[in-house]
Amino acid sequence: AGIPKSRIEESAAKKQAAIDQGLEVIVGVNKYKPHQKEKVEILNVDNISVRNTQIDRLNHIKATRDNKLCKKKLKDLEDICRTGSGNILGSAVEAAKQRATLGEISASIENVFGRYKANSKTLSGVYKNAYENDEGFLKINKKVELFEQKEGRRPRILVIKLGQDGHDRGAKVIATAFADIGFDVDVGPLFQTPEEAAQDAIDNDVHIIGISSQAAAHKTLVPILIDSLKKLNGEEIVVVCGGVIPREDYDFLNKIGVKAIFGPGTNILDAANDLIDILLKK
């Protein structure tokens, strides 16, 4: 039923609402903020080079192993999965001993069992209850209603994670808050490719794609997403980013078409207000 997961997400949303309201104090974020931005040295890693190195290593392993024996062990693993007779873990270890890769081992198992697809659900009411009768909250609600009158439907946002970034707390909090503000919210599955996310955005007919980035892949994956949208005639979709993104990278993202970037400590109501303003000005 996913009850523990939903309780954790509800707790995170309540905590974030309290932080945004200043009820939960975080020194330097919502109270006693520094007057000047401190420049932080960033280690830039060429992830394209790292990826190519890993691919070269995998190709070397495949070229130097006993491929016939390796394929037999992978076939044995798949047969055990299909018949239920034997030890799956033991068979996977035997395949690994013959230098089968994790991808190949996973594929053998997936051929029988398929791949799990998580259902992403958004909570409702947490932010609405926290901001009951709040002027700022009501003001944004009015802007959402104005957009609905203008466009014939509510603003729709797709909140996504790209690549191997599995840190989804921030994305789930954003989805919960924006739903309470009045947006229609879709949440993409974890570990999507940029091409898959672009197709989802087109299929769901969204106005905004919100990319939550916590794993420093924004300079690699966001350009691919934007190129994919162009190929699908989705240039009208507003692309924004949030999360841990160095300020030095803001110009790069803006130049390729990202309309807004929200760093750590951003008040969610401020972000929602900025986004609805972008849509109303289009």
Task: Describe each region flagged by the PLM.
Residues 134-153:
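Acidic, low-complexity intrinsically disordered tails
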Residues 1-139, 202, 206-207:
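Flexible, glycine-rich loop/tail regions that form catalytic "lids" or insertion modules at the edges
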